[in-house]
Amino acid sequence: MKKNKLRVGLLLNGYNISAWSFKMIEIITKSDYADIVLVIINNKKSELNKTIVLKLRNNFSRIPYILIRKTLNFLYEKLIERNTYLPDANKEVNSEALLTNTLTIKVKTIRKEWSDYFYKDDILRIKEQNIDILVRCGFGILRGDILNSAKYGIWSFHHGDNYINRGGPPGFWESMESWPETGSILQILTEDLDNGKVLCRSFACTNFMSVTDNRSNYFWKSLSFMTRKMRELYSAGEDEFFKKVEYNNRHPIFYSERLYVNPTNYELAKLIVRKIKEKISILYDNKFYLNQWILMFHLKNGFSSSLWRYKKIIPPKDKFWADPHVIFRNDKYYIFIEEYMYKSQKGHIALITMDEDGVYHKPETVIDRPYHLSYPFVFEYENKYYMIPESKSNKTIELYKCVEFPQKWEFQMNLMDNVRAVDATVFYHKNKWWMFTNICENEGASLWDELFLFSANNLFTNNWQSHPLNPIVSDCKTSRPAGKIFSINGILYRPSQNCSTRYGYGFNISEITSLDENNYAEVLVSSVKPNWDKNIIGTHTFNRVNSLHIIDAIYKRRK
């Protein structure tokens, strides 16, 4: 018997909504798990506009404040933010055609202090529609009976890490105060501000130089939280879904930070001065220094964990070398790398050969395509060597076979097509192939944040099954693959990148504690940060084969 779809209602300030909200609503309308059956429009906007006009007429003392704020905003946009690079998630889009056949209720709310309460008659009208989920894309802080007007409550985003940031505005304080990461959650609203029942939590690297791009990144990413959780509720059923929700929210959470609000003009002025200083420092570094990816290695029996012992392999200044992956054969190490040429702004796959004494030869190109290649994940299967280089710019995950070791490789097939994926890492375990890869589901979202897991019985297939817990990690600190999965004393370890602070900041080693068709879990056991050398400011790959331990690193050197 076919399940009834979830009945969804939308809380909007009007039909003109943000681009990211429009995309989310569009996905829901096309889904097989939910129908949008009700739109609730905040009908207070015109009255608010009149109120603002009257206040301005009767309160001239605010005019200087407003003029100063406009001046500060202008200075910020011209001196600091200037060009943004991501699609504007807050661009206004009209949704009326998308929702043309949906029942609409227009309501007015009662404002008490900072919160909005619904009138009883409107609550009754909403309850008559038997809504499963109300999605908040408008209104202010909601309290009162509206919180219980849908079977599963009001689902709402808080674009901030509610452990350390409650209030708003979204993405502002993280960027202006240069926090290493920016959090976001999907929650079921309660009376406690930004402390609802969390359905999903994620972290992204903060964009220090653009509040707009900082917001756009996690707006585009977080729209998928809503659609994923609706699909999960529909598929798993109410009991199983909310059993998991209750378990994940079992601990009390204290909040000991201030309640964040819009900055005063004085605060904004101080923040702008701080950002100008940061920008001058960045421009100075870019003028006189080169932040170049290099390789570092150490030969040692056992496990080499002291990074100050690693020796540098420094490329010429017209290129960088990164993403080392290794095959050991005939007493030699074959180190496959990304060789990136600054002039062409494109990478290809190159090979460095090293003997057991650490003597190595200059790299030679082995795979070059019209598009960028990196992260040459190499592995042996049935006495043959294969490679999965990152080919994100071609929207593919490609498999190559070595036909003449080590220089000649031939394209075999696309394991996935039409996908924005990076650093695919495969692993054979329990009679299955497992693929770990970071994916960007929505254009404008970062590729650093969300790790997806797929499985297949056969390596040579484009029918990879998505894991039910996808994304299995949604955190820029621990998601993106950083090398081959390895085993020590029967324990599986997964290297991952730490992309907080900046891309390529560090890497981690996590123990895989559970891996099957229905479960995945890992525990962070070690985190590497670039603290062992004043000229090393980042590292994001680790691999080991036999005695060779190899990483890449960002080396700050004079131009």
Predicted regions located by residue number:
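Short glycine/acidic-enriched loop and turn motifs that connect beta-strands
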Residues: 340-344, 392-395, 440-444, 499-502
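Recurrent small/Gly-Pro-centered beta-turn motifs in extracellular repeat architectures
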Residues: 337-339, 389-390, 437-439, 496-498, ...
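Conserved blade-ending motifs and adjacent loop-strand segments that build the rim/top face
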Residues: 468-484, 518-542
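Blade-level signature of beta-propeller repeat domains, shared across WD40, Kelch, NHL, RCC1
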Residues: 506-512, 533-559
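Trp- and S/T/G-rich repeat-edge/linker motifs of beta-rich repeat architectures
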Residues: 359-363, 407-412, 465-468, 518-525
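Short loop/turn segments immediately following beta-strands, especially the blade-tip
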Residues: 402-406, 456-462, 511-522
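One-carbon transfer enzymes
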Residues: 1-373, 377-386, 398-402, 413, ...
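A contiguous binding-surface segment within folded domains or other stable secondary-structure elements
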Residues: 193, 199, 445-480, 485
